[in-house]
């Protein structure tokens, strides 16, 4: 009758924009930018009387000699390879291995036969059955979860997760998104009907994280503001809670869609509540590509102007951009470079369009005979499983390489940082020391060693922070992501050391 479990979040296959490998490379330490949410969420569903241990492999080695009788492994497609390695290793050691999470939910056949038990979909409604079967020695090969009522969700077991080396915690306030972007895999297993936790639940989770010393939290929603009435009620509760904190305010990040820019009152409330930065899927200035992908919420607006509204409200936008749509021709790289240069957005997540397994895009590309089924999306930012329509694969990769070198050039990045600062209002609630944190300062020193351009850019950045101490957290975060991006480009052999362009030299001389 097994009653001990080891829950693992595996290491990613390779560096990514918002991961933290650069911290190890700069000899700062091994810890994630954001703490894992899946492992403490699953831990909260384990019955009383069980022994529970959590491992986030981004911060510690997996204990292959654990005494736990059951091993549970979660993960996304980017963790696919490591999920399989760990499942095989623990089965060889006689452990009962469960596998679940987004990747298994979307592509269960990929882990079938490798793990003993597959948990497909959301675990909450089937957790009691799973653990009862395990205790009885009668675990099934597969369990399928439904769409649970999040108002019944237990508080994650953050007490089992060490926050000492994590920069931010997570609270999931909802699941699902009503939009239907054809490349989005989230809605394929979480659904298009958004489900929410009550504000009191969210505050309870924030209280727990605050007591553990956390002062930065990702509100891990697929679209935080899409249901305005619900978002307002929650933000009002968070604002009231945050004003009562006596050992520093909590700051927040989340994901929202560009249509939030049409609601300045909501954005103002978000900033007062403590929202600091937000991820937005901008994708492309190519309207035909937006139509093709059913990204309707980005149509019929001036995207750069809408991003400007979000900055003017006091938020740092983290903009997701994509090339490789069927309507993208060879000119898309210059179009994207010009568009991105116009944004007051230091943080750009630039990627090639990939068709995730289980999405409408995957089905369409497969039906058209343009799907590379050998590629699964876990390796390289210039890789894709889609054979493009209007250019060769070689042209797409070469164009992407030029594009990332342009937008992440240190001077071009600095221009976007300064555009962000110029467009940002003064926020007295964010006033602090006019200097970077210790981690940011050590990353800056590591970046400066790359060359004269980086050194000069950092001098301008430090001067900017002295002028605008209210922006230190946002600019500091931008610096962390920029350093991680440069590390990632080095890892993939994509960074080109080039002489400055005339435009860059003009900035240098300004």
Show the residue positions of the predicted features.
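Radical SAM [4Fe-4S] cluster-binding motif and immediate context
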Residues: 154-318, 323-338, 366
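Structural recognition of alpha->loop->beta junctions
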Residues: 110-129, 269-277, 335-350
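Radical SAM enzyme core and accessory elements
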Residues: 1-7, 12-16, 28, 51-54, ...
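Conserved beta-strand positions
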Residues: 7, 73, 120, 219-221, ...
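Flexible glycine/acidic-rich beta-alpha junction loops that bind and position SAM and/or redox cofactors
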Residues: 12-21, 109, 228-229, 288-293, ...
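Short amphipathic alpha-helical segments and helix-helix/interface helices
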Residues: 43, 84-88, 108, 131, ...
């Amino acid at each position: 009758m097994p009653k001990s479990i080891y829950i693992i979040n595996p290491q990613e296959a390779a560096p990514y924009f918002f991961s933290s490998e650069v911290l190890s490379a700069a000899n700062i330490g091994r810890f994630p930018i954001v703490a894992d949410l899946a492992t403490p969420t699953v831990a909260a569903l384990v019955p009383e009387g069980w022994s529970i241990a959590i491992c986030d492999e981004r911060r510690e080695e997996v204990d292959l000699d654990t005494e736990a009788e059951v091993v549970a492994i979660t993960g996304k497609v980017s963790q696919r390879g490591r999920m399989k390695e760990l499942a095989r290793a623990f089965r060889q050691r006689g452990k009962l291995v469960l596998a679940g999470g987004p990747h298994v939910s979307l592509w269960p056949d990929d882990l079938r036969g490798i793990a003993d038990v597959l948990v497909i979909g959301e675990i909450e409604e089937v957790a009691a059955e799973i653990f009862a079967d395990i205790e009885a020695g009668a675990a099934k090969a597969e369990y399928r979860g439904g769409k649970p009522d999040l108002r019944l969700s237990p508080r994650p077991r953050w007490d089992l997760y060490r926050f000492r080396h994590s920069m931010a915690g997570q609270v999931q306030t909802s699941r699902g998104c009503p939009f239907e972007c054809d490349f989005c895999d989230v809605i394929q297993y979480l659904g298009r009907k958004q489900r929410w936790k009550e504000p009191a639940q969210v505050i309870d989770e924030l209280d727990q994280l605050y007591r553990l010393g956390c002062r930065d939290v990702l509100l891990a929603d697929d679209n935080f503001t899409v249901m305005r009435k619900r978002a307002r009620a929650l933000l009002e509760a968070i604002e009231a809670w945050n004003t009562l904190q006596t050992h520093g305010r909590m700051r927040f990040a989340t994901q929202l869609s560009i249509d939030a820019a049409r609601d300045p009152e909501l954005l103002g409330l978000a900033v007062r509540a403590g929202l600091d930065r937000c991820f937005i899927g901008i994708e492309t200035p190519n309207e035909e590509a937006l139509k093709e992908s059913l990204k309707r919420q980005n149509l019929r607006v001036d995207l750069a102007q809408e991003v400007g509204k979000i900055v003017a409200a006091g938020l740092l936008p983290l903009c997701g951009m994509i090339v490789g749509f069927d309507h993208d021709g060879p000119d898309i790289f210059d179009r994207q470079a010009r568009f991105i240069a116009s944004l007051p957005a230091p943080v750009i997540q630039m990627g090639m369009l990939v068709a995730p397994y289980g999405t409408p895009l995957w089905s369409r590309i497969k039906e058209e005979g343009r799907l590379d089924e050998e590629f699964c999306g876990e390796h390289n930012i210039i890789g894709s499983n889609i054979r493009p329509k209007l250019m060769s694969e070689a042209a797409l990769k070469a164009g992407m390489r030029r594009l990332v070198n342009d937008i992440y050039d240190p001077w071009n990045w600095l221009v976007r940082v300064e555009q962000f600062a110029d467009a940002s209002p003064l926020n007295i609630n964010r006033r602090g020391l006019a200097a970077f944190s210790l981690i940011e300062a050590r990353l800056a020193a590591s970046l400066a060693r790359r060359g004269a351009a980086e050194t000069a850019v950092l001098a301008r950045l430090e001067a900017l922070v002295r002028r605008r101490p209210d922006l230190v957290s946002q600019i500091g975060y931008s610096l962390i992501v920029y350093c991680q991006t440069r590390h990632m480009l080095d890892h993939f052999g994509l960074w080109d050391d080039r002489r400055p362009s005339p435009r860059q030299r003009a900035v240098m001389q300004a």
